[in-house]
Amino acid sequence: MDAIFYPLPIGETGDNEKYLEDFQEEDFQEEDFQEEDFQEEDFQEEDEDEEDEEVNEYPSDLDDEYPDSDYYDERSDRHWSDDDSDRDLDDLYDEYENYYEEVQVKKQNLEVEIIDITPEIEILNQNEKEKFNQVEDKLTTLSKNLTCIICLTNQVQILTIPCGHLIMCNPCSLNLNNSVCTRGVNSNYEKCPKCRTPIYNKIIARLP
């Protein structure tokens, strides 16, 4: 900074010294005022920067125009209206109608499949019924074959030789003629109750 020289007034030496003191005080006051003004300007600029940062933290006016913004809330949007609510209701109703139609189509397809499969189910049931009847008949026949044909109560135990019939229980076999004929010699012999063949021998068969 260039030095500025001010002419001193012509007078006594004491007056000159007093003038210099007053001049220096004025210079110091001016420098203090300049420093204070500079500090105030710096503080104002910092406050403005902080306010700008706070404003940037909140959505701008452009966010209202773009629903994709994180801050967008269509219910609080100033552009929201009853027409928008009606439009949403219409969209929901259309979605419901589409869903209902889809359900109805699936229901009809299921009914058709049930109608097609019903005859097959009936055939399977009929076949199962026939098989059951066959098994039942076999069990009945087997039960009859395992029951003594004389008393119709006890289980068969005696196997006749030579015809090989298993048709008598042991008590009924004892009640028959106890004589066993010798082949071609004795005419007084036991005969098979079923085929009337002479019995040459009897074997006790124990069934499980």
UniProtKB/Swiss-Prot annotation:
Residues 1-87 are annotated as: Disordered. GO terms for molecular function: zinc ion binding. Pfam families: zf-C3HC4_3. A zinc finger (RING-type) spans 148-196. Residues 83-147 form a coiled coil. Keywords: Coiled coil, Metal-binding, Zinc, Zinc-finger. Residues 22-71 have a biased composition (Acidic residues). Transmembrane segments: none annotated. It comes from the Viruses. Residues 72-82 have a biased composition (Basic and acidic residues). This is Putative RING finger protein 413R. It comes from Invertebrate iridescent virus 6 (IIV-6). The gene is EF2.
